[in-house]
Swiss-Prot record:
Residues 108-145 are annotated as: Disordered. GO terms for molecular function: rRNA binding; structural constituent of ribosome. GO terms for biological process: translation. It comes from the Archaea. This is Large ribosomal subunit protein uL24.
Amino acid sequence: MYDKLNVALSKDLRKKYGIRSFPIVKGDVVKVVSGARKGEGGKVAEVDHHSGLVIVEGITIAKIDGKQKGFGISPEKLQITHLDLSRSERFQKIKELANIKHITIQEEPIQEEQQKTEETKQEIAPEEVEAKEAQDKQEVKENDQ
């Protein structure tokens, strides 16, 4: 039983945050750096703390009945290429660790993403969306005739 599974960070992330490894969670993007699956990568689908393995989307193994099953990979064979900082406590921990090395980190990426989505929602009013859908339907009918 493992409490947290630490995984090495890519060189870009090491330089950006000043740390070598960080606990992996569902949503991080990883790359396999050794073993038979070297070079493959994807988003973390599941972290099995009981067996100490990480299951990555897109990396599967065939079962005897022909179905595909997620393939568990040991954390020491992985490298994090993109951190999922959607949880504020995780971002705060990164910020604290970077602060030790006197590295300043920009404003929370979550807030930036939320601002962008709010701006796009404000730009497109519901009436405009309905009008555009009606116009598209008319064009399809005209093309069919």
